[in-house]
């Protein structure tokens, strides 16, 4: 009960905190307006991290990650994948929207690429940029590597790791960290085996960390799946990886 009250108070207070520390950035994909967020330390020529949010678009988990990354000395930019007027309002619409970009992966890669350009415009050092993504965004992190986007590393956090097996595996020069919960029903042993095969065939520098007693959205404090201990471990693993490849 006390934990629930404290969590509610924290989440209520973070709205004001986020609004003060993250700046809106409008950008375009043709006629489609996109609305991203960037940390306040822009223009300082620092390593950069692009954050790809979960299937409902920019949320508190992505915002928390951005503010924490700023404390670690990174410029962080949260991408808007869907665009103004297309943000899902429920699980059904989120599933359809995310499903479209998973199927049309080149469109997903393009939206990620446009967000990377905004990150660079806001001061990120071009050859010191990484991508992290949650859930649907974790899929995007892997697509960044598959698409040879100009980033040195990606972190997929409880992402969908599978891809259409009709797609050919290609070379992968991006360093890859996959953080997946052991009890994620959306990821099968076959998905793991296919990903490992893909990474090995691409001669990638990869690692997979699996978190015990954890379900799909184990890193999200708002989710019933939240596992505080494992979420902290996953975040520390993310920071360690980013420090290795960006600092």
PLM features: what roles do these ranges have?
Residues 24-122, 222:
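Serine-hydrolase catalytic machinery in alpha/beta-hydrolase-like enzymes
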Residues 37, 193, 200-247:
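C-terminal catalytic histidine-bearing segment of alpha/beta-hydrolase fold enzymes
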Residues 65, 188-198:
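Short alpha-helix in the alpha/beta-hydrolase fold that links the catalytic acid
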Residues 123-134:
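Alpha/beta-hydrolase fold nucleophile elbow
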Residues 133-137, 141:
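Gly/Ala-rich beta-loop-alpha elbow adjacent to hydrolase catalytic centers
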Residues 150-160:
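A conserved short beta-strand
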Residues 178-180:
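Short beta-strand/loop motif that positions the catalytic acidic residue
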Residues 183-187:
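Acidic catalytic loop of the alpha/beta-hydrolase fold
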